[in-house]
């Protein structure tokens, strides 16, 4: 808790990644943090932070607007894609890879791209699209053994946009 306070006090652009997994479930809630500029989480983490078992993403988004949460935030939805929630709108981007091999690290890959782009470029739909493509490519490999290259990313983007 003390480290969180130190970070929030001394860093003015704070991106937060809280993807729940089997090792940290129930311990990594976004509600522990008060000051951040961007939040990325999976649907399970979204449910945990809102203290609900509700599965409908639209209901969860509506419920989040009644709770204290900073905008923008992104929720990864696995094979369904992801959604970026801002104060006045939500933007959904589908998944482009449906035959994944291993999703370990995909949330981290999504966060790496979207948090960096959120800092430098404010086209949130483009950021979400690139995050989904990068995370989807990452899920085509076992574990974190191989990182997606710039060429693989460019080739996939061109293929999707054709």
Q: Where do the language-model regions lie?
A:
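Conserved phosphate-binding/catalytic region of the ribokinase-like
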Residues: 2-36, 50-162
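Nucleotide phosphate-binding site architecture
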Residues: 47
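Non-cysteine beta-strand/loop elements that form the S-adenosyl-L-methionine
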Residues: 35-44
